[in-house]
């Protein structure tokens, strides 16, 4: 997202209602400095690490890396001074969609709290035409001199004299660009039903992009009310956070001025506008809130599912939080070009089309459940984030972690068909653990020294780990107590700002426990524990010895000797679905006694997999559980947790691939999608190692996979059966896809037949097995299959199918076809920038694909930086990771690291920004290499013993 590209000077629209600016009002010696605002782009951010001192070992990262760059060249960050704060904005913008520009006029009511002779605001990529000051209503404005820091995006305004505490008003006139970088006030492009190219304008202001649209105090602590007027062409729809209160024609009659009601107090990153040819469907909540879903023409019917869900969601949150949604309306709008999944602007929530729109006959179950989660996530932000906002980005998790948790609470309670808490285990818990097990992770409460670092923390720590820790705390305190604490927190800090300690205080008051003491270790230090457990029998009691240490994927030592307070739940074989005992582990090692456990009865920690920790069992304890895993008597949440822990322990060397395969083989009768997903992940590690060893080894490993998956695949078949739930079709897709990738010819033939019947006879492919079908065609269909997929992508109008064809085609084993795909997507720009990272997604399927993707990234890094807006763009950082993380040897790790050290396209600030993403990718490559070296002989022996 972010840009260091030159932004061309905006071309102004000719509009009678915008008065020409008297440029003689400008101080000439400051004009060039101000004008640079339209040509430079400084340090910015947004979603998904902090200053990591280039690629050195740092206090916040432990993974040693070769030094490169010049740390002293990093820009020293400076926040706005606290001697002044805004109370109200009046913003009037006049966008010209076809000229990609807008004129602006903004006033800011400012309270000066301490004597000062300057005021400072943020502005970026704006041509500031005049700045003036009004000290008393009715007084003449005074033109002011300014200077601009293009590194900090701070406009310093020199006051006519030292001013004592008082209220003043700043007045700005400016011109800006409707950019194509999906940040600030930007343009989005689409084609109508006749193939005509159209544009709409939308916004993305989180984290620091409101300054692209108007001068402002662009930090979350500065809350103010907003009046917004948008001057647009008569045939266009204009939207903002609040409801429309007037529409008046301009003097020439060609445009209209749309004025919106005054907003509640909110941070600048939550302001939003949208302008374009839009249509909508609407409904009302029980409390009378007008809900609308807006789309480009021809797609509004696809918004019905989200509209119905959003109505239910607002009503449910009103009750759960015991605070009514305070605005009269809430619009949800699908934007064709959108870098995030969605953005929670108060009253005008923006989404990618794929994250909001559902076609009942085309959307897969998995995607439909994701839409439900995203809709619920953004609407939860209306309380967590909008009503109560973090003071600074260090506490970003206060909004993202709780919105992530509440989305599951809502969908779990209102959409039981998705069995969403099962998917939570892999999508949230395992995802958060996967990143947090790296030495190059970061704490949930991560120090943000510079907003340039923000992009890298919109990641699985801020979202998935925070979400999982909230779930653990909710189970520990109980949902009613947890809810009571959250209500207290929201009511206490509504329309204001908070820090993590404020939340712990509210939860402590609600529970009567010291929640800060319990939870600070989980949010202030990176990583999480693995509990090593052993046992002994004492009559009818079981004595457990539990030792905690930080779980690190490379199996090495924790230099910080981290320690947590760990809520432990225990289940036993005689009553596997119940919690037999609860303990709180406070020391490095403790003994716990469980009464009434018969000799030979299994004992499992982390009952229900509610805790954010892994468990390493003695061989005796693990063996005792195998029969109940095989019979599925052990609950599904626990089966997943056990197998997922074993899969993660593979990398540490504490579990071998042979041990994992033994447990996986005991699950031959497994019937749950999420458990098979954990098995599939572990077998993927076996296949990745085998691929690095030799073609013969890979062939034998694939035969072992077929042996494990074949029976289940035969039982499932390919067709949906009457009465089965949504999870069964997803399981069918997972198992059959794995068989096909392992070279099982009958499965490949069946997928191929299904695809041909779809093209030739119009026989529909079930949405839940469509991606697997496309993947088989790309892998085994040669150029003919590739061309068919390309034609399908060119002719479809549905984004999920567009994305699935891209992911599938990137798996081709033919370099010429992969080159064609990359040229199509990147060089011809046939794929939207927000979706281009999917072109990397399947390349790790082959050695050729790995090497091609990495080489392509290296050769085109400048284009990627320009296209995505700089090194701190989340899109750029994710492409960087996808291009390298599937490698599996030390040579590649060094090559990857050295490239970024020596790349002359990158500045020292870029390297500083990329330190953690690069470190995480290098660490992932080395983990792959370590897994291979520790299991090479074990794999050879395993394959021989398996007679494959």
From Swiss-Prot:
Check the record and name the CDD domains matching this protein.
M1_APN-Q_like
* Tissues showing expression: Expressed mainly in intestinal cells in the posterior part of the intestine and in amphid sensory neurons and nerve ring neurons. Expressed in neurons in the male tail. Expressed in mature spermatids (at protein level).
In this chain, the site described as Transition state stabilizer is at 463
Instruction: Kindly list the cofactors needed.
Output: Zn(2+)
Q: Where is the active site?
A: 378
GO MF annotation: an example: zinc ion binding
Q: Name one Pfam family in it.
A: Peptidase_M1_N
Q: List the disulfide bonds.
A: none
Chain segments annotated as coiled-coil in the UniProt record: none
- Write the record's keywords in alphabetical order, separated by commas: Aminopeptidase, Chromosome, Cytoplasm, Cytoskeleton, Differentiation, Hydrolase, Meiosis, Metal-binding, Metalloprotease, Oogenesis, Protease, Zinc
Q: How is the cofactor bound?
A: Binds 1 zinc ion per subunit. Can also use Ni(2+) and Co(2+).
Q: Which reaction does it catalyse?
A: Release of an N-terminal amino acid, preferentially alanine, from a wide range of peptides, amides and arylamides
Q: What happens when the gene is disrupted?
A: RNAi-mediated knockdown causes an arrest at the gastrulation stage in 30 percent of embryos. The surviving adults lay a substantial number of unfertilized oocytes. However, brood size is only slightly reduced. In the gonads, the pachytene zone is expanded in 15 percent of animals and oocyte nucleolus disassembly is delayed. Mutant 1-cell embryos have a delay in meiotic exit during which chromosomes fail to decondense after polar body extrusion and oocyte and sperm pronuclear envelope formation is delayed.
The enzyme's E.C. designation: 3.4.11.14
Q: What is its main location?
A: cytoplasm
Residues annotated as binding Zn(2+) are: 377, 381, 400
Would you identify the family this protein belongs to, as annotated? Answer: Belongs to the peptidase M1 family.
**Stated name of the protein:** Puromycin-sensitive aminopeptidase
Q: What organism, scientifically named, is this protein from?
A: Caenorhabditis elegans
